[in-house]
Amino acid sequence: MKKYFLFLTTTLIGAVAFISFSFNDKQQPQPQQKFIIEHENDIAKQEAGTHNGGGNTIGYSFFSKAKDLKLVFRKRVLKPGSAIGYHLQNEDEIYYIISGKGIMKMNDSTFAVQAGDAILTRPGSSHGLQQTGKEDLVIIINYEAK
């Protein structure tokens, strides 16, 4: 009986200690996750062309749920006939053309873009992008989060 009582007492003390440490408000914060990996298949969204551009696009907002991320990193696939509508830019924004062809309007200029082109739009500029040809226009978009 003494052994059973000793075992029960030890178990009870251990359980109380475990519970008190588990629910202690003064626990150290967990370190921030060191990396995040996302696959485009998991985040793809069918969307109309942004900024009233029209047509069908697929948007990929990578790391949109990452806490305190200061950058926006997106991929957009513009299907034939679709566009990103002409709009005012409030922060630096980079478009990088992965594949396909398009026509970009930037302020008073209009010019062709293709795979390998990178376009930096500065604050206060306006721009839009129209897909051309039969192939999808695939771009990466990067800017500072608001």
Question: Could you say what each language-model-derived stretch is?
Answer:
Residues 67, 123-146:
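Ligand-binding loop in jelly-roll beta-barrel domains
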